[in-house]
Amino acid sequence: GVAAKADSIDFATLGVATASEKDDLQTIKGIGPFIEEKLYALGIYTFSQISKMTPEIEEEVNVAIEFFPGRVKRDEWARQASEFLQA
C-alpha cells in the first residue's frame, strides 16, 4: 500500500506531523478526497509539510501516491500551502 512507500519520502526536510494536527489538504487545488487519504497514509498531514516540498520530494510523493509524473509540481502544491500558512 501507500504507507509502505513513506520510507522513500524525505521527512527530515518536510518535518513530521500526526493525524491530530492535520489540515484540510483538499483546500489545495489538485488535492481531492482520494489523494488526501493517500497523503495522510504517507504521513503528510499539514500545509507546513507540503510547503517544504522540494522538486525531489514532489517527485517522491508523485511516485508514492501513483500520480502522473510532474503533477504535484504543476499544481504548485508547495506554493499554495505556503499561501495558506501566511493567510
Mark where each language-model region is.
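C-terminal extensions
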Residues: 1-29, 33-87
